[in-house]
Amino acid sequence: MAFNDLLQQVGGVGRFQQIQVTLVVLPLLLMASHNTLQNFTAAIPTHHCRPPADANLSKNGGLEVWLPRDRKGQPESCLRFTSPQWGPPFPNGTEANGTGATEPCTDGWIYDNSTFPSTIVTEWDLVCSHRALRQLAQSLYMVGVLLGAMVFGYLADRLGRRKVLILNYLQTAVSGTCTAFAPNFSIYCAFRLLSGMSLAGISLNCMTLNVEWMPIHTRACVGTLIGYVYSLGQFLLAGVAYAVPHWRHLQLLVSAPFFAFFIYSWFFIESARWHSSSGRLDLTLRALQRVARINGKREEGAKLSMEVLRASLQKELTMGKGQASAMELLRCPTLRHLFLCLSMLWFATSFAYYGLVMDLQGFGVSIYLIQVIFGAVDLPAKLVGFLVINSLGRRPAQMAALLLAGICILLNGVIPQDQSIVRTSLAVPGKGCLAASFNCIFLYTGELYPTMIRQTGMGMGSTMARVGSIVSPLVSMTAELYPSMPLFIYGAVPVAASAVTVLLPETLGQPLPDTVQDLESRKGKQTRQQQEHQKYMVPLQASAQEKNGL
């Protein structure tokens, strides 16, 4: 395609691509921290009721005389006796009786601060009857991510990738910092929602800006690099959270660096492909010549002119006369088909992913250890995914990742709750497959949608992912009906979604489409190739039958 030839002319993968890709993906280290930050800032330590203020523990015995026991013999977290309960005359005279009347924790709670000295749970007592508020905070963050995917995906197609990224960095820095100083839970949730919005824009535009500056043969490498940076961010979160256990300090530490990202983002070069798709040929020429100078291809850049670009990018200029809206995804049959299929893939991946990663305390092992393990499994999983993406194609990679993830989660549902090692061993490969699925779907979506609506399509796909992440915590409530019910649901959805991939075209080695006509011509070309393949196979089968005497 013409634009890919222009990229090769100005240096292909040169100094500019190396610098800009590095600077654009660097914030993703901390984006991973924000997405699962509440595993640590909202961790629930062991707790029990505080005895009445007038209770004289030294006179009335130990704390246990106020605390009923659960089935496992541990103190109840949300109930206390209305009066001290004395059992039969044991030698120490302090054996608690579990048959007395109980009441809620009207005087508050006592928390075990040995592992988590300070969380939003301990600061605002988000336990027992207020336990749902903890999950509400994460759901509101995901609502913000959903809104950000819709708003900033659309704005990026209208205003450009660079401008939206600059705005997103500033919004993340300000809202994240304000979250660290939130005086109450309501304000905390409001700023978390704003952080989610801006981080969604960063995620979308990071992928698109990088892919649009890269030649065809390097796009999969860039997508995999972005996935690895996100995985490294999970390692970073485990280490930082262990070193900084106070939630306000941790929140500030993962938010303040976005001020630096905001400052250097002014030096990014806007996508020349977006300029051409918007009909701004002068800005396209200026961007390409600037990249040529950075890549040491000054002479090749000087050969470019308005006439050369006008001849090479005639299709983009024609397309740029009108901007496509989000409604075009439903109005156009070809785009509608892509939108519905990709929406299912985005939803299933995010739904199952957050069902696993936001319940680290449910595995019965150290929360810091499981965070490291979940980050570590991404490395081999994404490497295998990269090899499959580049050798077999995007479609089989996407199908295999979702199918294997679903199977692992379904198997986990039949393992007894007390077998934490076995359950963790099944959850880890499932999480790795979902991480590989995220890696693939980002790249696959960007390659399927045409330039005129690519960012809007990415935004709508991410929107469906956020719907999955919002619904996921609600599904966990079905554990009250049957403990393994959430896992069965988390596993069934990606298995069903894996079948949808057969309805999508392969993009391996294909140029990025700029218009809907490009999509239709590519579909027609692949159909003709399949027909020719079938015609070729029929004589071969007939010949084989003749040889066998059939």
Swiss-Prot record:
Residues 1-9, 157-164, 217-224, 270-337, 390-395, 445-455, 506-550 are cytoplasmic. It catalyses: prostaglandin F2alpha(out) = prostaglandin F2alpha(in); prostaglandin E2(out) = prostaglandin E2(in). Pfam families: Sugar_tr (PF00083). Glycans are attached at N39, N92, N113. Involved in the renal elimination of endogenous and exogenous organic anions. Functions as organic anion exchanger when the uptake of one molecule of organic anion is coupled with an efflux of one molecule of endogenous dicarboxylic acid (glutarate, ketoglutarate, etc). Mediates the transport of prostaglandin E2 (PGE2) and prostaglandin F2-alpha (PGF2-alpha) and may be involved in their renal excretion. Belongs to the major facilitator (TC 2.A.1) superfamily. Organic cation transporter (TC 2.A.1.19) family. This is Solute carrier family 22 member 6. It comes from Pongo abelii (Sumatran orangutan). The gene is SLC22A6.
